[in-house]
Amino acid sequence: MSEQTIYGANTPGGSGPRTKIRTHHLQRWKADGHKWAMLTAYDYSTARIFDEAGIPVLLVGDSAANVVYGYDTTVPISIDELIPLVRGVVRGAPHALVVADLPFGSYEAGPTAALAAATRFLKDGGAHAVKLEGGERVAEQIACLTAAGIPVMAHIGFTPQSVNTLGGFRVQGRGDAAEQTIADAIAVAEAGAFAVVMEMVPAELATQITGKLTIPTVGIGAGPNCDGQVLVWQDMAGFSGAKTARFVKRYADVGGELRRAAMQYAQEVAGGVFPADEHSF
């Protein structure tokens, strides 16, 4: 019997037995032309919901710096702040592939530092893979991790950890810079990455790279032709502030509903409406 996935019959959107998603499923989906979704997750409860919804890949992103800890950028967050979040997500999502971000400062020094950081996420956090930002400049780190048996998702284009160097949140790979983005994509693939995130890259360039690579591409602000797509769940579900990036589509108003529920709860407590007899022993 062939191995089944969360989607059933190994195809996104299908039905059937639910088993663990592995990196080879993503490779197969690329070969078969099946697109798939990835979301961030930072705790047990939301990870459980996303797993039940059939999201095959969950990213414990360093975006937790913004949406969990309230930092202005992703730069300050540490391994020690991320690992407890990874543990919760892994427990809540028995079927999804859980990828953990290596935070700024944990891998730039070279392969030895990258291996130490990634090992912590797998051993202490239970992550199934790690993600790190950069193209050619981190190819050696990627090769080291994959040689050690650690699956790596790469991240090129706009890399949030380099926001200060890049001069803010800007589209990458326009004009002459396109060749460097292509070189970065090829470098991470040749180093052994099982997939590559492309952030804020022109759609035409992302399409070209997706066609060149044998590994899956994951877009975030990179057009519709990547093999997968990823969003921060708070942006996707309307839980973050009113202003979001152009590439975000809101599928709900979770923030508004939570605010309404909290206000109603407070009003009913103040007015003596809650708890009522049916809520008492």
Curated annotation (Swiss-Prot):
InterPro entries: Pantoate_hydroxy_MeTrfase (IPR003700), Pyrv/PenolPyrv_kinase-like_dom (IPR015813), Pyrv_kinase-like_dom_sf (IPR040442)
Cofactor, how bound (note): Binds 1 Mg(2+) ion per subunit. Can also use Co(2+), Zn(2+), Ni(2+) and Ca(2+) to a lesser extent.
Active site (UniProt): E199 (proton acceptor)
Source domain of life: Bacteria
Subcellular location: Cytoplasm
GO molecular function: 3-methyl-2-oxobutanoate hydroxymethyltransferase activity; magnesium ion binding
Gene Ontology terms describing biological process: pantothenate biosynthetic process
Annotated EC: 2.1.2.11
PTM comment, free text: Pupylated at an undetermined lysine residue by the prokaryotic ubiquitin-like protein Pup with the help of the ligase PafA, which leads to its degradation by the proteasome. The cross-link involves the side-chain carboxylate of the C-terminal glutamate of Pup and the side-chain amino group of a lysine in PanB.
Annotated catalysed reactions: 3-methyl-2-oxobutanoate + (6R)-5,10-methylene-5,6,7,8-tetrahydrofolate + H2O = 2-dehydropantoate + (6S)-5,6,7,8-tetrahydrofolate
CDD domains: KPHMT-like
Co-factor(s): Mg(2+); Co(2+); Zn(2+); Ni(2+)
Keywords: Acetylation, Cytoplasm, Magnesium, Metal-binding, Pantothenate biosynthesis, Transferase, Ubl conjugation
Annotated segments matching region Disordered: 1-20
The protein's annotated pathway: Cofactor biosynthesis; (R)-pantothenate biosynthesis; (R)-pantoate from 3-methyl-2-oxobutanoate: step 1/2
Keyword Cell inner membrane recorded: no
Residue numbers binding 3-methyl-2-oxobutanoate: D62, S63, D101, K131
Misc remark: Was identified as a natural substrate of the M.tuberculosis proteasome. Was identified as a high-confidence drug target.
Protein name: 3-methyl-2-oxobutanoate hydroxymethyltransferase
Organism encoding this protein: Mycobacterium tuberculosis (strain ATCC 25618 / H37Rv)
Gene (name only): panB
